[in-house]
């Protein structure tokens, strides 16, 4: 009882979100003296592989290790090598001492790779992006590298402009950077994207969420900037160039001495294809941007450490024109910026109790400007928000229990200014706006909001059985005042002789509405917009169910399979203002989504590695619609409507695959492919002659108007990399990528004239040079 009382009282004053632990290695000889050693740490199930060298005292700390099983290899000339198994199950550091014996009298101890291939305690599937995949990733378009990596995972798909959709969800993607959550849309069209070069590890999950995760639970992407501190000065640089006049660069420096480590990084880019163009000509699609960031780590003692991170990012880009807009001379400029600072402190009370406290402040902004030749609408926007975050958690290891409790608060100050001027109600014979829509409109709003949460969770291990349970409380107080209790349950059963883990999970979810244009869509402006109908936006509530398995095959491959079902009230989606890229959150009264996912992964088998993944999804939404910028007659039909329909992310079949071959110790080759069966089409213009004039016969041939879907798309990419120089930590690598190898015309979305139609880029290439020391 005293332990539980301490647990909850400390949590009340101390919720960082991180499912990662730490191993503190100490290597000794037979006399007990510390000795310098080298080796590697590997976890095939968690995608971790790091080579290391201890210091002269034989110590080395490995941070940011996702929960799972690891193999530590330790060696030194004149001593027998050893490999040991270490299970990381909590955030509390694990002290691992290894004694090396003289080679002539020692017996080598080995732990096979297959031990780490399947995580026997995982109650849900989580996809871990290996360091090799981060390093040798395709040279994606600016702002899309980490988005493309997530899109390779089962259950995820991309709509126009790099917007990620996990298991049919719109918006509800949570990004956790060093344990601090970011809930707003991070796609290029919405905000400044995160650069992948500054991150050391990445993992993705779509179910089995511990109670510490909340507010946005379509899917969670965890990004970690932790690097194991290596004494001295180190750095890396990269330069990328390719089609569409693309150029980008990244550089970072890290210096570590004693208990301190500091790093600085910067990046910049310029391209003539930033967003997904609506027509093949790729009109007005230029963008440029940059970012600066800094990190500071201080280890005060074996029990205390502090981490700080700051970044500033800014992007300016043009909105791609369609044919008639280009002919009219339209130009629309958008900018997105973010400045962020965060700090965290970890205190280890003893080997079983760990406390973490985190804080963050950030300021984001988004602007839209249109020239006088914009058609059929001239929109303007100036929005942003300032956000403060404060949270803490306490983790306790007690026998077979891994307990954790915590609380956090978000403090938001939101401002929005939006306006439009209609410059054409009709284009030719095609009506774009109803006559009762006012020609001009202006909105200005400001509001402070608060969100609070608290949680408690436990994971219990007994032999082959793992059980997890948690309870979360949320209060939302921005545009509504609602509370929710959300239980979470999970179970896993391991059958080691069969290399099989069976698992199941249940998540009750409570999700906040998206931040973009939130004040506008929450105000009843129907009388000013010619609609006469309005429903207020509310948080989403729902239930997620999943059952699945993980199977080791021949000790080399891992097969993951998951069946899932989601039932959500007030299902979040978005309402795009024609093709401006300005989006307004909406919610359908209810949605049900079910599907199956599978992934076959080969971490490495000799020179070969790779994966194949398949996703099947069926999603139906139900009217009416709340929120949004609903103009004219659309408001009545959507707000007062009834019936069901395919959700906008209802893509039945998706396939992803990649194979990589280490053809030579200095050269590798890779092929990557993807297939998408096609998204639903919401056609707002039935005049086929007009559509043909705007898009051409080639694009229209990619749309099945009878079925109301985009026709299937497929793409093949090829990559090659060569190590030009490699000595210890110094390396120079060159990589070349060719995308859409067969130059296939792929339509991502087709929603009619001026309403967000998007095309995948044709055949293009990129070359990237990397250097590190």
Predicted regions and their residues:
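C-terminal beta-signal and adjacent terminal beta-strands/loops
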Residues: 666, 674-696, 711-715, 722-773
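Surface-exposed extracellular loop regions of Gram-negative outer-membrane beta-barrel proteins
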Residues: 314-316, 322-323, 365-367, 415-420, ...
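Gram-negative outer-membrane beta-barrel transporters
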Residues: 461-466, 563-567, 586-685
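Transmembrane beta-barrel wall of Gram-negative outer-membrane proteins
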Residues: 241-270, 280-316, 333-355, 487
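Membrane-embedded beta-barrel scaffold of Gram-negative outer-membrane proteins
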Residues: 356-360, 366, 494, 536-594, ...
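Periplasmic N-terminal accessory/gating domains of Gram-negative outer-membrane beta-barrel systems
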Residues: 78-80, 84-97, 105-211, 215-227, ...
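Periplasm-facing N-terminal accessory domains of Gram-negative outer-membrane beta-barrel systems
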Residues: 14-127, 140, 181-183
């Amino acid at each position: 009882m005293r332990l539980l009382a301490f647990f909850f009282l400390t949590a009340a004053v101390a919720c960082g979100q991180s499912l990662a632990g730490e191993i503190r290695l100490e290597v000794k000889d037979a006399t007990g003296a510390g000795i310098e050693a080298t080796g590697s740490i590997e976890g095939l199930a968690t995608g971790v592989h790091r080579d290391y060298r201890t210091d002269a005292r034989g110590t080395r700390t490995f941070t940011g290790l996702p929960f799972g099983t690891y193999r530590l290899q330790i060696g030194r000339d004149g001593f027998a090598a050893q490999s040991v198994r270490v299970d990381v199950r909590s955030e509390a550091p694990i002290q691992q001492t290894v004694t090396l014996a003289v080679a002539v009298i020692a017996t080598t101890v080995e732990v096979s790779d297959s031990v780490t291939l399947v995580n026997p305690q995982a109650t849900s599937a989580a996809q871990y992006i290996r360091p090799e995949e981060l390093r040798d990733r395709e040279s994606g378009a600016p702002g899309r590298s980490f988005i493309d990596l997530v899109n390779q995972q089962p259950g995820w798909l991309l709509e126009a402009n790099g917007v990620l959709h996990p298991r049919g969800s719109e918006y509800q993607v949570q990004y956790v950077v060093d344990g601090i959550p970011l809930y707003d849309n991070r796609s290029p069209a919405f905000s400044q994207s995160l650069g992948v070069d500054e991150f050391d590890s990445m993992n993705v999950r779509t179910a089995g969420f511990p109670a510490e995760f909340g507010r946005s639970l379509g899917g969670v992407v965890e990004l970690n900037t932790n690097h194991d501190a290596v004494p001295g000065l180190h750095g890396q640089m990269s330069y990328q160039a390719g089609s569409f006049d693309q150029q980008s660069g990244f550089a970072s420096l890290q210096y570590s001495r004693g208990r301190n480590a500091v790093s600085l990084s910067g990046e910049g880019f310029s391209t003539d294809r930033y967003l997904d163009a609506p027509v093949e000509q790729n009109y007005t699609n230029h963008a440029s941007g940059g970012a600066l960031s800094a990190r500071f780590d201080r280890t005060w003692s074996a029990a205390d450490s502090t981490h700080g991170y700051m970044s500033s990012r800014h992007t300016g880009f043009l909105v791609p024109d369609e044919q008639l807009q280009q002919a009219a001379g339209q130009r629309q400029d958008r900018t997105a910026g973010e400045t962020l600072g965060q700090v965290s402190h970890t205190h280890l009370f003893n080997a079983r109790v760990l406390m973490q406290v985190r804080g963050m402040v950030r300021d984001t902004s988004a602007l839209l400007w249109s020239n006088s030749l914009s058609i059929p609408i001239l929109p303007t926007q100036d929005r942003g928000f300032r956000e403060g975050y404060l949270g803490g958690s306490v983790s306790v290891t007690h026998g077979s229990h891994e307990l954790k409790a915590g609380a956090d608060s978000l403090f938001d100050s939101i401002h929005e200014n939006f306006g439009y001027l209609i410059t054409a109600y009709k284009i030719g014979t095609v009506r774009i706006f109803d006559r009762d829509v006012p020609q001009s409109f202006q909105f200005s709003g400001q509001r402070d909001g608060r969100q609070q949460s608290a949680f408690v969770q436990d994971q219990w291990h007994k032999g082959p059985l793992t059980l997890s349970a948690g309870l979360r409380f949320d209060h939302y107080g921005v545009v509504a005042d609602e509370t929710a209790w959300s239980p979470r349950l999970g179970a896993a059963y391991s059958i080691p002789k069969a290399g099989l883990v069976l698992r199941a999970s249940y998540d009750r979810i409570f999700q906040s509405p998206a931040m973009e244009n939130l004040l506008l869509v929450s105000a009843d402006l129907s009388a000013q917009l010619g609609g006469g109908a309005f429903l207020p936006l509310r948080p989403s509530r729902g239930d997620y169910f999943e059952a699945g398995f993980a199977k080791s095959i021949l000790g080399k491959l891992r097969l993951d399979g998951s069946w899932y079902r989601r039932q959500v009230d007030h299902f979040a989606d978005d309402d795009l203002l024609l093709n401006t890229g300005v989006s307004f959150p909406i919610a359908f009264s209810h949605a049900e989504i079910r599907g199956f996912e599978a992934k076959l992964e080969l971490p490495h088998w000799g020179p070969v590695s790779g994966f194949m993944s398949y996703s099947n999804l069926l999603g139906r939404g139900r009217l009416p619609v709340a929120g949004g910028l609903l103009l004219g007659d659309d408001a009545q039909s959507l707000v007062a409507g009834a019936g069901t329909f395919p959700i906008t992310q209802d893509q039945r079949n998706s396939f992803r695959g990649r194979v990589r071959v280490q053809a030579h110790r200095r050269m590798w080759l890779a092929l990557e492919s993807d297939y998408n069966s096609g998204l639903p089409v919401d056609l707002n213009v039935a005049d086929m002659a007009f559509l043909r004039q705007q898009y051409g016969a080639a694009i229209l041939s990619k749309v099945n108007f009878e079925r109301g879907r985009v026709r299937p798309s497929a793409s093949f990419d090829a990559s090659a990399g060569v190590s030009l120089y490699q000595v210890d930590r110094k390396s120079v690598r060159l990589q070349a990528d060719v995308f859409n190898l067969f130059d296939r015309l792929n339509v991502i979305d087709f929603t009619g004239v001026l309403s967000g139609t998007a095309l995948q880029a044709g055949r293009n290439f990129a070359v990237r040079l990397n250097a590190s020391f």
